[in-house]
Amino acid sequence: MNTLLLLAALSSQITFNTTQQGDVYTIIPEVTLTQSCLCRVQILSLREGSSGQSQTKQEKTLSLPANQPIALTKLSLNISPDDRVKIVVTVSDGQSLHLSQQWPPSSEKS
């Protein structure tokens, strides 16, 4: 097995399942953990466009099982071409586990 694939399989991670219909994006952040935990989940959504700025923040504590992808929430956003949007998902057990991932990835236009 490729070393990179093996490392990905052995590490906890946050991923985003994204679909788009016109200007409407549906974004589902998922977390997969190597060990189960009682984790604090924070989802921060920032948006800036011609109509102004908005920021929303969701926080909750979840009991997350190991080795299976868990959908954390479902976001549906109407994003115009001139809008700048950033979603940051953080999962932490307050000790050794701290994951954070941004959508869109910094290599994409936001």
Curated annotation (Swiss-Prot):
Signal peptide annotation: 1-8
InterPro entries per UniProt: Curli_assembly_CsgC/AgfC, Curli_production_prot_CsgC
Pfam families per record: Tafi-CsgC (PF10610)
Keyword Chaperone carried by entry: yes
Subcellular location: Periplasm
GO cellular component term of the entry, any: periplasmic space
Induction and repression of expression: Under control of the CsgD transcription factor, part of the csgBAC/ymdA operon.
Domain of life: Bacteria
Cystine pairs: none
Main subcellular location of this protein, as a coarse class: periplasm
Keywords, sorted A to Z: Chaperone, Periplasm, Signal
Function of the protein: Plays a role in the extracellular assembly of CsgA into thin aggregative fimbriae (Tafi) fibers. Assembly may also require CsgE. Tafi are thought to be assembled via an extracellular nucleation-precipitation (ENP) pathway, and possibly also via an intracellular non-CsgC-dependent pathway.
Family classification: Belongs to the CsgC/AgfC family.
Name the UniProt record assigns to this protein: Curli assembly protein CsgC
